[in-house]
Amino acid sequence: MFKGVQDCSNIRWIVYFNPSITIRIDLLKRITIISTIFAAVSMTTLVVGASGATGRLLVEQMLERGQHVRIIVRSTDNLPSEVISHKNLSVICASILDLSESDMAEHVGECDAIVSCLGHNLSFKGIFGKPRRLVTDATRRLCNAVKENSPNKTVKFVLMNSTGNSNRDLKERISFPQKCVIGLLRLLVPPHADNENAADYLRTKIGQSDGVIEWVAVRPASLTNEPEITPITVHPSPTRSAIFNDGKTSRINVGYFMAELVTDESLWDMWKGQMPVIYNV
């Protein structure tokens, strides 16, 4: 639930509210603060889907925070030159599902977090062609690779998902018309089922007490392109119909929130094992 937005001397605050925890985040100055605080505590994060519209913005956010970032991409053509040349960026050019088990284990080795921004291209081939289980299979293989390494620390896994996917742990209420539409999407549009299955893998196979992997599945509403970070609201479940009145979430806000999850332990503790929904204010 959203508690409130406060304007104070050109500083805009957003308030995240969970039944027992409230956090205020300075949206205009936060990135500078984060970069200063975490420069001495740099983490390594693996990002898959980094060449996509949201993945690029996430990578930029992480690098601005002084973090070390590894990306697995088929091509760097969609990435800005200043990102590709950044001293804290490591690029692995490969198709993630073509990597061997040993290569996958090597790439996730020593990573503190993994973020998946994978998705299907919005074309006929992208929607109906192979691989139909891109997000699910990548999630499963990345988690298996983490476990294969037997890390001595808990690894964070952040999955970019969708408000069209329900958190079945919470038995979220959905109207009958929406259930009908979602059922058709599940049968007729492979990427929707893929998104559902990927989140279900984290929810049921990794669960709440894995000991090696902790996870968050981030559910934005309809994605938009905006030039700057703006206030957002964060909720445990959708507050509006994902089909008939979805609302908007800018890609830069999604990247910002996922970067916050990786680098802010208090925010991570608030949402781990959950599927937070984010909307633009």
Residue ranges, per PLM feature:
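Mid/C-terminal beta-alpha module of Rossmann-like enzyme folds, strongest
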Residues: 44, 53, 241-281
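N-terminal Rossmann NAD(P)H-binding glycine-rich loop of SDR-like oxidoreductase domains
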Residues: 45-65
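Conserved glycine-rich Rossmann-like NAD(P)H-binding loop of the short-chain dehydrogenase/reductase
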Residues: 68-74
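NAD(P)H-binding glycine-rich loop region in Rossmannoid oxidoreductase-like domains
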Residues: 71, 80-141, 145-148
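Conserved beta-loop-beta element that borders a ligand/cofactor-binding pocket
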Residues: 199-225
